A protein has these predicted regions:
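Structural detector of well-ordered beta-strand residues that form the stable sheet scaffold
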Residues: 4, 67-70, 90-92, 130, ...
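Glycine-rich Rossmann-fold phosphate-binding loop(s) that bind the pyrophosphate
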Residues: 149-150
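Rossmann-like adenosine-cofactor binding region
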Residues: 54-58, 172-241
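Phosphate-binding beta-alpha-beta segment of Rossmann-like dinucleotide-binding domains, i.e.
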Residues: 87, 94-143, 155-158, 162, ...
């Protein structure tokens, strides 16, 4: 099998293929769209990250020998999964690859926001002492709303509980009577918007989650609510924010 790699993979990742002599790997980083169209049928599989878009236009030209699209990442929003499925092409991703990293980054952003860390750092770097300008908020006892309790959402919820926050969550694929093995209240989406002091989003980008955070949902939220999005950008309507 010949595999095309169009985006950056670590040396360790590429070395995994060396164990299989029947696999030939061709790394072509930053392959532009027209070049991809001209060479893609020389391979039976492609591995991408975020830069390469495997949309219906590309997938439609794939011949019958093409077997697999692999994305080295969590989401597959840059792959037209429906078009691939119609041609019998397998689409794979790595849903747990960056779960811990993303959960930790979410909490890092949370502390930065409530403690005004970037602003205070910039002030100190400018050789100023403006201590009273950067008073923060205490997180203990605050209501922390998680939208999406998948691999990442659960890890974030665990960390929020460790800080002493009350955690509420919504996930349409988890029933309210599910035992989560942690003290998280499963509630309707509207309750998350209304009750949370902090809202964090951990969903894929789909037609159902695009602009999930927009004018309608924002109007339900508390004044001064903190919104953290470590998922896909399209989930939050930035103009409405």
């Amino acid at each position: 099998m010949k595999i095309l790699v169009t985006d950056g993979l670590s040396k360790e990742g590429l070395e995994l293929f060396a164990k299989y002599p029947e696999i030939e790997v061709d790394v072509r980083k930053k392959t532009d769209r027209e070049e991809l169209k001209s060479i893609i049928n020389n391979y039976q599989a492609v591995i991408i990250r975020s830069a390469t878009k495997m949309d219906s236009e590309i997938i439609d030209i794939l011949d019958d020998n093409f077997k697999l699209i692999g994305r080295a990442g969590i989401g597959v929003d840059n792959v037209d999964v429906s078009a691939a499925s119609k041609k019998g092409i397998i689409v794979m991703n790595t849903p747990s690859a960056n779960a811990i990293t993303t959960a930790e980054h979410t909490i890092a952003l949370l502390f930065s926001l409530v403690r005004n860390i970037p602003q205070a750092f910039a002030s100190m770097k400018a050789k100023k002492w403006e201590r009273s300008s950067f008073q923060g908020k205490e997180l203990y006892g605050k209501t922390f709303g998680v939208i999406g309790l998948g691999n990442i959402g659960r890890l974030v919820a665990e960390r929020a509980l460790g800080i002493g926050m009350k955690v509420i969550a919504h996930d349409p694929f988890i029933s309210k009577d599910t035992n989560l093995n942690m003290p998280v209240d499963l509630v309707d989406m509207e309750e998350v918007f209304k009750d949370a002091d902090i809202i964090t989003v951990h969903t894929p980008l789909t037609s159902g989650t695009k602009n999930l955070i927009s004018k309608g949902s924002i109007n339900l939220m508390k004044d001064g609510v903190i919104i953290i999005n470590c998922a896909r950008g399209g989930i939050v309507n930035e103009e409405d924010i």
